[in-house]
Amino acid sequence: MASKSDKQVTVEVKNNNNGRNRSRSRARSQSRGRGKSVKITVNSRSRGRRQNGRDKYQSNQRVRNIVTKQLRKQGVTGPKPAICQRATATLGTIGSNTSGTTEIEACILLNPVLVKDATGSTQFGPVQALGAQYSMWKLKYLNVKLTSMVGASAVNGTVVRVSLNPTSTPSSTSWSGLGARKHLDVTVGKNAVFKLKPADLGGPRDGWWLTNTNDNASDTLGPSVEIHTLGMTMSSYKNEQFTGGLFLVELASEWCFTGYAANPNLVNLEKSTDKQVNVTFEGSNGTPLIMKVPEASHFARTAVARSSLPTTLARAGQNTTSDTVWQVLNTAVSAAELVTPPPFNWLVKGGWWFVKLIAGRARTGTRSFYVYPSYQDALSNKPALCTGSAPSGMRSRAAVMTTLQFTQMNQPSLGHGEMTATLGRAIPSPGDTFNVVLTIGQPLAPNTLTKQSWLNKTTVSPQNHHVVKIAKDVNNYTTMQGFTPISSVDWYTTDFQPSEEPTPIPGLQVLVNSSKKADVYAIQQYLNNQTNNKVQLTSIFLVKVTTSFQVNNYLSYFYRSYGTGTTVENLKVRSDTTAQDVNFPVGWYLMTNTAIFNAPAPPGWIWQNVELLNDTAYLIDQGMMHLIMPPPANTQLLFEMRTSVTGSRSMISSEEPDTHEPGDEWCDALDASDSRVFLEETDYEDEEDEDEDDEADRFDLHSSYGSEPEDDDENNRVTLLSTLINQGMTVERATRITKRAFPTSADKTKRSVYMDLLASGLSPGNAWSHACEEARIMGTNQMPNVSGDRGHAE
């Protein structure tokens, strides 16, 4: 290059403006769309003799360094790399071809924060960590390594093609079209390496790409590598299709980064695989193309958990969408099996697309996503619009089971945090009240849509059979009467924002012969005055059967008979019963119980266990509306329900003999919270205790630890409780303060015995049982049973 003494190397940098002048205020950025011609002059040192090989190399290297320095000084090569990182990323396996046609097996996006394996985690390596710290990236080289997982003679019938997609945009590409790209054909059973140079990988900003995937798609994604297969994969040893993996895919490259700009949340982008998911597409003329997947699928649950939903409402007839974009890759079934409304059949046939979660919940147990033909369209919220509906003969086809690989493309919030805060969604906590929308399922035999609803009438069952009990413990339970199957449950907050499904209510369960069959998720009670001295209580329970079971019960139904003239009789229960089997498969059910007892009803949750009465008028209250006739399938019921039981107590029906013994209410099963309260109590009161005592002291009441007789304490308890409730205090808090101010003899005895037995080494359960027995003896002067709280001092 500089072998002669008079040799000059000329590199000149000029701006090519195509003869157009621009003012300084309108000058374009040097990093975009400007042609450059380069001219640099280098004078070599004169030498008196011919250069040998070493001198020639040094001279060439000197010239090369000078040229590189001058080019960088003129801004032709963009910013200097701040750090470079070599890494080998394992991306997963290439599966076999199942249809015989062109199938996509992998789509590898080269942005460093997106280069992850599909293991379902957010773990990251050095490349992802650097991508979250720097604003620009580029590749020095890229090698896609395919390591064979089968022998050359083990399978046949399939060829693999690795190709470069410079725009990272889905396209309608045939096998011949893939051959028009830069590509490499690979024979199954042999290792291969697809090599790409910087000229194939350069970005729009002097070879650099932006790292933040929230920016323009054409500046951030970089090129992508797609891997397709053609021809059905057959086993050479068996006359059957081969379904295993063909290649292990690894990415060996050197990423360079520059421009420090920390976006730590970019390392948490998730990539995973849902191997068994039903996918359907919907759309009509002029409406966006919608992809639907089951609400319980891994993809739907992940998208809901990691998507940010706006709280603003959309215009009429429109839906709001999440800000999070997902790339979806279909790798399991032929695109011909997925029925798609026109004109975007090619998009689904291509095997990968982009989606965004639609806010709210579908009412069929599915999650809906808008489909986008490119990442830029997804960022701009321009979904694919259909020009028609799917062919009428294909609309009734069942959903196709497939495998979806999905990648979280962006993170709306780039600051610290494992995941974005999901706006408009609430994570329920115990005690929350929810609006619950129940979608009715098919009637449960023997019920039909054309006849009255059968329900269990009695609290006993035929011989060798058992009733269904919704129970807190052996003393607090109710018998199931009505049973309505539910196909899906939608949870909303009190202001009707979509919410996650809560956990089952601790301590509540559905029992058959002391065996747990279901969990209880939500409850509610409706109390109405039935007559002047009677009240009607209807309890509803939303339960999820975890183990299918069958019961045989005495069934009856409600009926309404017409009187003379314009008078109409109230709802009554048929006195005759029929013993019938009822099967409960796994799933959701709404169970009910209605009871009539003497007024007044105490506050708190009431456990009643009486059978439906003959010749007694029942009111059609809020919890019984669906028990007259079975509601049609897919209709919906709305209830405001609770997710905890507080202040519960048992009631003895006036129709049953009173076998209640003094002290019974103090001997429920010991809960973990009871034990914790006792153990945390000391001789020194904490700040909360002092506040409660102060509230009690304001009423100038005396402690029961003094010399006042027990009957005076009883009057004081009633007075204080009524005063606190009238002042607007909750029943639970008023009861707690009253018990602390005037504990009963049973309270004192139970607490003392319990603490003594614990100190002696007895287990909490046994200590509680013995304390209850002592409290039973001392329970002659008990506090009025205003709630189901335990009888200990709090």
UniProtKB/Swiss-Prot annotation:
Residues 21-37 have a biased composition (Basic residues). Residues 1-72 are annotated as: Basic. GO terms for cellular component: host extracellular space; T=3 icosahedral viral capsid. The keyword Nucleotidyltransferase does not apply. Residues 396-425 are annotated as: Core attachment. Belongs to the astroviridae capsid polyprotein family. It comes from Human astrovirus-3 (HAstV-3). Residues 426-649 are annotated as: P2 globular domain. Pfam families: Astro_capsid_N, Astro_capsid_p. The record marks 315-316, 395-396, 425-426, 649-650, 658-659 as: Cleavage. One of its GO terms (biological process) is clathrin-dependent endocytosis of virus by host cell. Keywords: Capsid protein, Clathrin-mediated endocytosis of virus by host, T=3 icosahedral capsid protein, Viral penetration into host cytoplasm, Virion, Virus endocytosis by host, Virus entry into host cell. Residues 73-265 are annotated as: Inner core. The keyword tRNA-binding does not apply. This is Capsid polyprotein VP90. Residues 681-697 have a biased composition (Acidic residues). Residues 650-794 are annotated as: Acidic. Residues 1-59, 681-715 are annotated as: Disordered. It comes from the Viruses.
